[in-house]
Design a protein with these regions (language model features):
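Short, acidic Ser/Thr/Gly-rich low-complexity loop/linker segments typical of extracellular
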Residues: 455-469
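Structured interaction patches on ligand/partner-binding surfaces of diverse proteins
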Residues: 487-510
């Protein structure tokens, strides 16, 4: 349970209600009313329950409904959502007249994660008060939760930080400084100072505890904060100056049978010990509550939560300039604050605020929100942190350590309403691109160099491994240009864009480099039968060839076409010559300068020599075998057709690498 400093505010809101119940002279009910009026919700819940059980369901229906409503409110204040839901349902069953019973039933059901029944309760309440913004936001939150549960699972990893947790409430963790080796938090463990239980929560009053990492980076056993911090009162919810020498803490003091004062105090550190806290004066207003301090990373501001006048309802987040206090008090405005409660601020950066709220649409109870301040310092953009950071219960008091990891507090899954500390981690989204650099025979290219340039300004270079493989680490949502090359080979360029998905991804791209010193077959160039007309399916291969020439602007080539051995030699020379020229004509039309291109038809005069790649595809042909006429005549009819197909090819040969250089 959290230090709830809304006691004073709540007492005034429920004064009329207590007048009605006060008309009953039953001593036990009068005792319950008095406990409730002082904010002693734990004690009052027990007394109200005893009164409720003795009232007749038939004769005392009206009073039973009123007591059930009060009992529901006690349970709600104790964060015991299932008990609160049952009590409010009893109040409605006994026709309790205040429509707020439906509103609070909706809140309690939402805190249980029963979203559809919660929507129904909110809608019933809106029949009485159709303009109520909190009820509307409650419905929005329920719908958001239903949609989120059906959607993609978040990458966040959330675990119970068992070392820090006791059998009572443990919450609001905070690192001491940038070293991240010491963490402080608030606890109502049985080891807390003092002997008396809190009449408000039924547990011991909270103290400040801490844990330190050992030389192996493991957290040590938690101990009470050293020095004069912990007393018989409630202390906790701390923040620290950037140098870790000043602690800001919340102190709730209560005299017997009296109201509770909630204020911010400061303490100074000397070695490992803390001085006796001194009150931090914010205003002269002594009726309002001030708590949940959060120092900004640059030490300029102290953010805090308060129900002081001038807010937007409930408790708001404010800030005060620590260097110029006079006249610097500032409400963070309606983008942050709502008609509900905004509490537990935490500044990760001077323009990045985290806080808990039950006024913005959420999953139930308090939700954690992230807010960015724009470049002009005039507007906050607020975002719910979503599942699994948020739950149907109370989620609050976050702090960040290294990267996207840290701790926060939640009472999720605890029917008693006790808070516990959880760790969280958002694993880095790993985006990579990998592939191979091979030659036309699909063999690794030695010492190939791959460069990758992103429109985010990144520029990486890597030498392919001996097997031709490479791998780069990338960022999400970036356009990249990659170029692969090696001595004795033409460069190849490829472009792509990584997407924005928050998922690991490994893009794959291979580079096939053409060697300069020998002819290179151009795959997938097709002609009409017995003609030089290029078929439409050749376009992709021809366009890739044009791009290769653009990527290698100092290269000139000869296009060569080859035929099988059917037909006369003269006929085949003529056909292949026309086919080679057709390719050159296409490249010129694609923007390649004509003086970089020549062509020649070889007919059947240069039969293909079997390469490793051809051997893998046609194992019947041994590597280095020349597919000439004498060899082909020894083959079966089927293998002869395969050999003819291999011989029918279009190739290019680099003729110069110095074009237009001088």
């Amino acid at each position: 349970m959290k230090i709830r400093f809304d006691v004073l505010l709540f007492i005034s809101m429920s004064a009329a209600m207590l007048l009605t119940l006060g008309s009953c002279k039953t001593p036990k009910l009068s005792e319950a009313n008095a406990q409730f009026g002082r904010g002693e919700y734990f004690n009052a819940s027990k007394t109200y329950k005893a009164v409720y059980n003795k009232l007749s369901p038939k004769k005392d229906r009206e009073l039973r409904g009123e007591v059930a409503y009060q009992l529901g409110t006690c349970y709600r204040r104790l964060n015991m959502a299932p008990n609160a839901s049952a009590a409010y349902q009893n109040a409605i069953r006994y026709e309790y007249p205040d429509s707020m019973a439906f509103y609070y039933l909706g809140r309690s059901l939402q805190a249980e994660g029963k979203y559809q029944p919660a929507i129904e309760a909110y809608n019933t309440f809106l029949e009485w008060k159709p303009d109520d913004q909190l009820a509307k936001e409650g419905i929005n939150g329920c719908r958001m939760a239903i949609k989120a549960k059906e959607g993609k699972k978040s990458r966040y990893i959330v675990k119970n930080a068992k070392l820090f947790n006791s059998r009572r409430s443990d919450f609001a963790p905070m690192y001491l400084d940038k070293e991240l080796n010491t963490i402080y938090y608030t606890s109502s463990t049985e080891k807390a100072t003092g002997t008396n239980k809190s009449e408000i929560t039924g547990t011991k009053k909270s103290d400040i505890f801490f844990s330190k990492k050992d030389e192996n980076g493991k957290w040590g056993k938690p101990e009470p904060a050293e020095g004069a911090l912990n007393t018989e009162h409630d202390e906790g919810i701390v923040s620290f100056s950037p140098d870790g020498q000043t602690m800001y803490l919340t102190v709730a003091r209560r005299a017997p049978e009296a109201d509770t004062s909630v204020e911010i105090y400061t303490s100074r550190r000397s070695d490992a010990s803390w001085s006796e806290p001194q009150k931090f004066e914010i205003t002269a207003d002594t009726l309002s509550a001030y708590g949940h301090p959060a120092a900004s990373p640059d030490g300029t501001y102290l953010y805090f939560s308060s129900d002081m006048p001038g807010g937007y309802g409930g408790k708001d987040i404010w800030r005060i300039n620590l260097k110029e206090r006079s006249g610097s008090l500032e409400n963070l405005g309606p983008q942050i604050n709502t008609a509900g409660d905004e509490m537990f601020p935490y500044l990760r950066a001077d323009t990045l605020l985290y806080f808990a709220s039950d006024g913005h649409p959420g999953f139930g109870g308090l939700d954690l929100f992230k807010a960015h301040l724009n470049s002009t310092g005039e507007r906050w953009s607020v975002e719910n942190m979503g599942l699994p950071i948020n739950s149907s219960g109370d989620d609050f008091g976050i702090t960040y350590g290294l990267g996207e990891s840290g701790f926060f507090s939640s009472n999720r899954g605890d029917a008693r309403g006790y808070d516990h500390i959880y760790s969280f981690e958002y694993p880095e989204v790993k985006v990579t691109i990998s592939g191979m650099v091979l030659d036309k025979d699909e063999e690794p290219v030695p010492n190939a160099i791959i460069r990758i340039v992103g429109d985010d300004g990144s520029n990486q270079k890597e030498v392919a491994r001996d097997d031709g493989s490479f791998r780069f680490k990338l960022e999400r949502g970036v356009k990249y240009v990659m170029m692969a090359g090696a001595t004795g080979y033409l460069n190849v360029k490829q472009e792509f864009e990584s997407d924005m998905e928050e998922e690991d991804a490994d893009y794959e791209v291979d580079f096939i480099l053409a060697a300069i010193h020998k002819p290179q077959v151009v795959e997938n160039i097709f002609y009409d039968f017995d003609k030089a007309t290029l078929r439409p399916e050749s376009k992709e291969a021809l366009d890739e060839m044009a791009q290769m020439l653009r990527d290698n602007p100092n290269v000139t080539i000869e296009m060569g076409a080859h035929t099988d051995m059917k037909g006369s030699e003269e006929y085949n020379i003529n056909l292949s010559n026309r086919r080679a020229k057709s390719v050159v004509d296409y490249l010129v039309a694609a923007g390649i300068r004509a003086d970089r291109l020549s062509w020649k038809g070889y007919g059947e005069t240069v039969p293909k020599k079997v390469t490793k790649r051809i051997n893998r595809e046609y194992p019947q042909f041994a590597e280095d075998t020349v597919l000439d006429e004498p060899f082909i005549e020894t083959l079966s009819e089927e293998d002869q057709e395969a050999a003819d197909q291999i011989n029918r090819r279009t190739e290019f040969q680099v003729t110069s690498i110095n074009y237009d250089m001088y």
